[in-house]
Regions:
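C-terminal beta-signal and adjacent terminal beta-strands/loops
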Residues: 4, 646-653, 676-753
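Short, acidic, small-residue-rich periplasmic hinge/interaction motif at the N-terminus
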Residues: 31-33, 39-46, 73-77, 88-130, ...
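Short acidic/polar hinge/loop motifs at secondary-structure boundaries
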Residues: 61-63, 178-205, 293
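N-terminal periplasmic accessory domains that precede
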Residues: 88-94, 137-140, 159-162, 189-194, ...
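Extracytoplasmic beta-strand/coil segments of soluble accessory domains associated
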Residues: 138-179
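Flexible loop and strand-edge segments within Gram-negative outer membrane beta-barrel domains
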Residues: 271-292, 298-365, 371-389
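Membrane-embedded beta-barrel scaffold of Gram-negative outer-membrane proteins
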Residues: 364-378, 476, 484, 518-572, ...
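Gram-negative outer-membrane beta-barrel transporters
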Residues: 544-552, 572-655, 748-750
Length: 753
């Protein structure tokens, strides 16, 4: 009852208004003083949280009834902000090129915490993605305390994230608001998105909107890719590091005419050789080769109709395990060589169409469709797991901005999954079909208050009827304080193998009941207060922000490595499972072009385990602190970045704790630094990661005999009291970095129109 009261607290009465048509024009201001229209530039209406796109002539129209703050942006250009007073008929926006080094104007950086969004959203901009190497999406969160990144195990190289103290499987991943990285595509999904393909990343905590489905439990991470309308006919990036990692990216955007444009992006990367820094006989990271290609197209009609479509091809092949392992000798007990081979292949296609139903675009209808085929073939020692998944998604959305105060959105969604998966001759295949209807209402009586409430009703072929209410509210009582609250319900179908990939890198058996309920059901609610402080360099924003979020599961699939030393138990939750997360963020520019951002997050995560009761959730970091400093010289010719992390302890699973002689992992620091030199069209950057060289030593238990049980012989260096504790092979308890100090160098070349 309390949850429903929380969701329905803030429904208010309607307010009507009279609108006037406003005309805007966005131009590129050339270094020689000339101008030219910027087609398909984006204009953000801050008070209404609406994104508008200019037409082929750089023009747009908007219905206005009150004072409006409009921000015009275009990839590779500065932004321009215009405050439009009531009665203003038109305004012009002038953007300059970021690489016009003869300009004296310094490029403004986008705030990483938008002030007027109803949901607190952390934005990692293109400039933020360049603060570190960010070879892939998985490596883009090192400056964020909201998201914790680690390895699922010490063998496969699969990176996993945690948000609000829970696995990334409870975070909905979106590609320009299309659900992605679902099912068997999830374990390595973040490694399959090159960082240089991205324009920005938005991190929103909590269940968010009902429009994109029910799977957002702890939050949503949305990726914005480079656009077909980019003014970059050619972008090239190359990268290499001391741990044998290499990467190359090429992107090319072409505007054929006023209607058609496209962008192609190619990625080649991987790890070229094997290394064993801690001398345990296992590769520190797998040898890997990844090929990635995408093509994205845009058609823009004079009527305002837009069609976007594209496709993607992925190939990834990795080999891990003992140093002597090959694909020919690893899957064989007679050789006594433990190896891991994982091959991912994927094909994706999508289609979007948006049709305006009014001249000023206050009403429109859109269809989003997506198809994904993914294959996952693997073995881990003597365990083999092969899977194939076909997924289809369609979302029909009607949107109507009735006036400045009221907006409604409603529609229908279809989600289909055909999953074939075999583990050691056992068939765990399933077929799932879900159809849902949704509605969402937005109330904005002024620029100080926003309420969004939505409902999603779904019929699922596996789980029956599912009902998800969600709501969020923003209130700014004064200009320098913003308060937000949100709450809602989320559901997902557990994928017991790929959600927990690290379990394959053990010598343990799996105990899976025949009647295991795969439905996971949770409520999440929380709030935020942000203070905008009156100090700092001119034209910058100083803020202090406090968050609290609570997550509570009604249903959950529990993966228990502690009940039985020789097995991993799967069972349905019988008791409580919850997390409490507190976070504080502070950002200031004490000097022009010098930014300091500090963040601290504390998590209290509990779960009920059989025979143990309610305990601290294992392998969940209690806290994380991040300090980032960036300084740029005039015109951004030189940029210096430094990041320091303090990673808090995790409770270790029972048997790992006994072997290592410690109940929790140690607190450890991580330091990163990068220097970038910008020339006209070329950026050269050098950097270092894990500067202190901190590593988790002996991360693999029983590495001497991965096919048997070791009673301490030859492994007593892990702890003094472990000599009589049976040690079964287990590489799944990773709490720290596996690689030592790393240096890298890279180059980015951009050809501008």
């Amino acid at each position: 009852m309390k949850r429903f009261l929380f969701i329905s607290l803030i429904f208010l009465t309607a307010v009507s208004a009279t609108a006037q048509t406003f005309h805007g024009y966005v131009y590129y201001q050339k270094p020689n003083g000339g101008t030219e229209p910027l087609p398909f530039a984006q204009v953000y209406h801050m008070e209404r949280e609406k994104l508008i796109e200019t037409d082929a002539n750089g023009e747009f129209t908007l219905k206005l009834t009150a004072r409006a703050t409009l921000i015009a942006t275009y990839v590779g250009y500065t932004r321009d902000t215009v405050v439009v007073e009531p009665g203003t008929a038109e305004a012009k926006f002038y953007l300059t090129g970021e690489n016009d080094l003869d300009e004296s104007k310094v490029v403004a950086q986008q705030s990483t915490m938008p002030k007027l969004k109803s949901i607190k959203t952390e934005v990692i901009t293109a400039a933020g993605l360049c603060k570190m190497a960010c070879c892939a999406l998985a490596e883009s969160f090192e400056n964020s305390a909201s998201v914790t990144v680690g390895f699922s195990d010490a063998v496969t190289g699969a990176r996993q994230i945690k948000l609000l103290g829970l696995s990334g499987t409870y975070t909905q991943m979106l590609d320009e608001n299309r659900p992605v990285m679902r099912g068997i595509a999830a374990p390595f999904g973040m490694s399959f998105v090159p960082g240089q393909w991205l324009e920005s990343i938005q991190i929103a905590k909590g269940p968010s909107s009902v429009i994109n489905g029910l799977e957002a439990i702890t939050g949503q991470i949305n990726m914005e890719h480079r656009k077909p309308t980019d003014e970059t006919p050619l972008f090239v990036q190359v990268y290499g590091s001391t741990d044998a990692m290499f990467e190359g990216n090429v992107a090319s955007a072409i505007q054929f005419n006023e209607k058609w444009s496209m962008i192609n992006m190619v990625h080649v990367g991987g790890t070229a050789s094997k290394m064993d820094h801690n001398q345990d006989g296992f590769r520190d990271e797998p040898e890997d080769l990844q090929l990635n290609f995408t093509s994205r197209w845009l058609y823009y009609a004079p009527s305002g109709m837009q069609i976007r479509f594209g496709g993607r091809f992925l190939y990834d092949d990795r080999l891990g395990g003992q140093m002597g392992a090959t694909k020919d000798n690893a899957f064989n007990l007679e050789n006594r060589i433990w190896g891991s081979s994982i091959k991912n292949r994927g094909v994706n296609g999508y289609f979007k169409i948006g049709v305006p139903l009014a001249e000023d675009n206050h009403a429109n209808i859109a269809l989003v469709a997506d198809f994904n085929h993914h294959e996952f073939d693997s073995f881990f020692g003597l365990k083999n797991y092969d899977a194939k998944q076909n997924s289809a998604f369609a979302n029909l959305i009607y949107q109507n901005e009735i006036n400045e105060t009221h907006k409604v959105e409603f529609g229908a969604t279809w989600q289909f999954d055909d999953l074939t998966q075999l583990y050691s001759r056992d068939d765990f295949s399933r077929w799932e079909n879900a159809i849902s209807g949704f509605g969402e209402y937005t109330l904005t009586p002024g620029d100080k208050f926003t309420f969004v409430g939505g409902l999603n009703l779904q019929y699922n072929s596996l789980h029956g009827w599912l009902f998800a209410p969600r709501a969020n509210v923003r209130w700014a009582p004064v200009d320098w304080v913003t308060l937000r609250a949100l709450g809602g319900r989320g559901y997902r179908t557990a994928n017991i193998f790929t959600d927990n990939l690290g379990i394959f890198s053990t010598g343990k058996n799996f105990v899976i009941p025949d009647q295991l309920d795969l439905l996971e059901d949770a409520w999440t609610w929380g709030g935020n207060v942000t203070f905008y402080l009156p100090f700092g360099a001119e034209d910058t924003e100083t803020y202090l922000s406090f968050d609290y979020f609570h997550n509570d599961f009604n249903k959950q699939v529990v993966v228990d490595p502690e009940r039985n030393m020789l097995a991993i138990d799967f069972y349905n939750l019988d008791g409580k499972s919850y997390t409490n997360t507190w976070q504080v963020d502070f950002s200031v520019n004490p000097l022009e072009r010098f930014n300091i951002t500090a963040t601290f997050r504390y998590t209290d995560a509990k779960v009920t385990l059989k025979d143990k009761g309610l305990v601290e959730r294992p392998m969940t970091s209690r806290y994380k602190g991040v300090l980032n400093m960036q300084y740029a010289t005039a015109m951004n010719k030189w940029t210096f970045d430094f990041t320091a992390q303090l990673n808090g302890p995790m409770r270790l699973p029972k048997y790992a704790a006994q072997v290592w002689g410690m109940e929790t992992s140690p607190v450890f620091p991580m330091l990163y630094a990068q220097i970038t030199r910008k020339f006209k069209g070329i950026d050269i950057y050098v950097g270092a990661e894990n500067i202190l060289g901190y590593r988790q030593h002996h991360a693999i238990i029983g590495a001497e005999d991965p096919f048997g049980i070791n009673f301490g012989v030859g492994d007593t260096h892990t702890m003094a009291s472990s000599s009589h504790i049976p040690q079964i092979f287990d590489a799944s308890n990773v709490w720290g970095p596996l690689m030592g100090r790393k240096f890298y160098i890279g180059l980015r070349y951009t050809l501008w129109k």
